[in-house]
Amino acid sequence: MERKIIVSVSGASGAVYAKVLFDKLLHIKQQVAKVGVVLSDNAKEVWKYELGNELYKDYPFDFYDKNDFMAPFASGSAKYDTMIICPCSMGTLGRIAGGISNDLTTRAADVILKERRKLILVARDTPYNLMSMNNMITVMEAGAMNCQVTQR
């Protein structure tokens, strides 16, 4: 079964995790019909700072502006299977937990949750404060999965 996947890269540090995810998606391209990507302005800056390049532009994915509410996955009728926010900043997590759909990332996350599809949040900002942990609980209760990563 070919999947349709949304990847959002927020402005949290950890651009290397987004790059690894992009590379893995290329590796399994025969199993993926579409990959739609949203990068926040901060994500673009962090990528350039941490990785020293802007090579995210070279990946053969469909890129969308952070404010493009006409992107297909801004609606449940597009039937994207999975959304991965990698890395997921605590600000993005908080907006999703609060139901605030103020950009394409948070709108798509809202759609994925209401359609009972898979939302994976790759939290990066550790240690967590109490508000962030409560936001994680809220999104998990709504059906999302939280995945913490650390560098080796």
Where are these regions (language model features)?
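A cross-family phosphate/adenosyl-ligand binding-site feature
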Residues: 1-120, 126-152
